[in-house]
Amino acid sequence: MDLFESLDAVPEAYGPVAITIGKFDGVHSGHRAVLARLREVAADRGLRSVVVTFDRNPMSLLNPAACPQPLLSKEQKLERLATTDVDGSLVLTFDRALSEVSAEDFVSTVLAGALDTKVVLVGADFRFGARGAGDVALLRELGEVHGFEVVVIDDIALEEGRRVSSTFVRELLSEGRVAEAAQLLTAAHSVRGVVVLGQQRGRELGYPTANLDRNSEGFIPADGVYAAWLVVDGVRFAAAVSIGNNPTFDGVPEKQVEAHALDQDFDIYGKRVEIEFVEYVRGMVKYTTVEALIDQMCLDEVAVREILGVPAKETPKK
């Protein structure tokens, strides 16, 4: 996938193209259906297929208090877009200057000017330009002026009628329903970050953990224990992951993401790792004794092994 992180980076003769425009947070099954349609339209007309997206949610600038947490970082989003087989992605920096560009100027500068757009695929509720002044009707009018066609794509809905959306995925993750979220995302939801030194309590209890730093990427699911895969240098390890503030111990006010890799005891401090969530195991509980916590951690390991299909490590015979 060709990646352009500014209009100036787009080669002069890159077009003509078919495009779709949006945040694409999560790159979920609804997004993928749109991108599949984009590829079809582009192939039928001999055009390149291009996604136009933003480096952040525009609401983070326009209405920060109402802006939801992103499901993915910009880097994660681009990686997932690359798996959709589109020809290119143009990432626009959504700053104050871009927010004040009129709908007409956005079309003439970005769509017609930089990309030489011939087809635009959008949803029925698509808005663009300063203060969201542009809608599908205006886009069609501008298409007649600049020589592109507008194709409106229907939303993708589940069997029960719920629209597939980033908001829905965020709701599922907020409830710990990572397996259901994965179905909509067409991949395991993941977070990534650098492993930092924690309080070493897990190691003292016989369950050393990799603690992610505060600046981890990706939406953190609900507090609880999860079966997951810990990815280190491209290698996946079965893991029990704890999210929360360790209620059994005092003095842990901040939410932590900790991964215990089964049957592993390695030094990965300072490494950038990824956690792929598979299934929710249980909620966080405050135990009255350390022994009770250790007993539960043993049960958690059994549950995680069963979920991930990882047999217990055999104890060498004496």
Where are these regions (language model features)?
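Conserved beta-strand segments of alpha/beta enzyme cores
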Residues: D2, D87-L90, E149-V151, E274
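Short acidic-hydrophobic, aromatic-tinged amphipathic segments that line or gate anion-handling sites
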Residues: D2-A9, Q69, L90
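N-terminal catalytic cores of NTP/NDP-binding nucleotidyl/phosphoryl-transfer enzymes
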Residues: P11-S73
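Residue-level signal for inorganic ion chemistry
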Residues: H28, L81, V120, A181, ...
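Cofactor-binding loop segments of dinucleotide-utilizing enzymes, especially the Rossmann-like FAD-
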Residues: F54, F94, D155
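N-terminal Rossmann-like or analogous alpha/beta NTP/dinucleotide-binding catalytic cores
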Residues: S60-H146
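Glycine-rich, Lys/Arg-enriched anion-binding loops that position phosphate/diphosphate groups
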Residues: D135, R140-N245, K318
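Phosphate/ribose-recognition catalytic cores of enzymes acting on nucleotide-derived substrates
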Residues: G198-K318
